[in-house]
């Protein structure tokens, strides 16, 4: 697998507003989330992965081992159970279980990572470029 560790800056967003609406994110949080351009920071420590989202609005971190369930706070503020698995060499598939099932796919392609998030038939695509 290629070295995915590093920082990636959001390049653009497609359908993010509709995704946040379907998720049930409140107006103020949604407005702030749409205006910032977060940096995705990826670190690997043995078999543990750390994905951080850093912005002027909010910083989040998930630390996980592939296939092991953990809890995290979803964008709408709800605490959910999450599992992340690898699909092939460069794709991480995250499934959040709660009142709604959310799927987030992070596909690493050289100096880019494409983040695709889906809930209830609505999909958002957010490409990031290595900083």
UniProtKB/Swiss-Prot annotation:
Gene3D superfamilies given in the database record: 2.40.128.20
Presence of keyword Phosphoprotein: no
Function: FABPs are thought to play a role in the intracellular transport of long-chain fatty acids and their acyl-CoA esters.
Alphabetized GO MF terms: lipid binding
Chain positions recorded as (5Z,8Z,11Z,14Z)-eicosatetraenoate binding sites: 106, 126-128
Keywords, alphabetical: Allergen, Cytoplasm, Lipid-binding, Transport
Subcellular location, record wording: Cytoplasm
Main location group: cytoplasm
Written domain comment of the UniProt record: Forms a beta-barrel structure that accommodates hydrophobic ligands in its interior.
Assigned GO CC terms: cytoplasm
Keyword Transport recorded: yes
Residue numbers binding (9Z)-octadecenoate: 106, 126-128
Family as reported in the entry's similarity comment: Belongs to the calycin superfamily. Fatty-acid binding protein (FABP) family.
Descriptive protein name: Fatty acid-binding protein
